[in-house]
Amino acid sequence: MTRFTSIGLCAVLLFNVCSCATLQKDTIASMLKKGNSPRVTRQRRQLPSPCGSLQPGQLCCDSYKYNPVTHLCCNDNPAVKPASPTAIPGCCDQSAYDRNTHLCCDATLSPHPPATTLPACCGPVVYDSSVNSTQLCCAGAVLNKPVGVPRALCCGTATYNPATQVCCMGFPVPKAGGPNATSLCCGPFSYDISTQMCCNGNIALKSATHTHCCGMFSFNPATHLCCNGYPYPKLGFISPSCCGSLVYDTLTMRCCDGSHVVLITPNQDPCANLA
């Protein structure tokens, strides 16, 4: 009797264990079918807001609550929007401002200057950048245009008159050849492109024949060769070429070791005797 009782109890326990396992399996399968699981549900749970519970229409600005209708979040600070109905609100560091009336320059808020048609930033300062303005922003500083020079431009930290000057290496330089000449820079100097050339940082004379540079010099390629940065006459050779700083005729001569010129001898190596 005891033996049968033990067998019965084991059967009941085994049935319960199997039933629990089956129920748990069915429950997990059902949750997976619906697209969630205990782990997934835990991952999808939203983190608490850093500024606590929000009312409808509220947003978080760092740890502060604010109403985006009346405020802007400026650098983690709720700032009151400009009151004007036509304002174009913007942030300047932690403050809100109206873009129609102010400019934010290097986190500094400044009003538009009076009678300014095209306000702009020059470092932390506001200036009038319009064509007819009397000011220029040069290297981060506001400079006044010279009197009577409405088309003045910047040259480094100074202004210059492009009608009479050129800007060479950050400095205003008078135009070579006068105001009506076309001048360019050759290093820190200006030169007249109609009568001069810039050859390797040196201003050389230009003519109808001297139209090319050879080192720091101008030369006539029809009558001279440029050898090692210096012009040398072709000496009437039919096929002239350079051998170092020497000019030779390739039809009758040979250049040996890049510095010696010898006559070509039939059936002999002209450079052999130089060894």
From Swiss-Prot:
Q: In which tissues is it expressed?
A: Component of the acid-insoluble and acid-soluble organic matrix of the aragonitic skeleton (at protein level).
Keywords noted in UniProt = Secreted, Signal
Pfam families on file: Galaxin_repeat
Q: Does the keyword Flavoprotein apply?
A: no
Is Secreted among this UniProt entry's keywords? Answer: yes
Cellular component annotations (GO), alphabetically ordered: extracellular region
Q: Which residues form the signal peptide?
A: 1-20
Question: Which InterPro entries does the record associate with it?
Answer: Galaxin-like, Galaxin_dom
Q: Where in the cell is it found?
A: Secreted
Q: What is this protein called?
A: Galaxin-2
Which organism's genome codes for this protein?
Acropora millepora
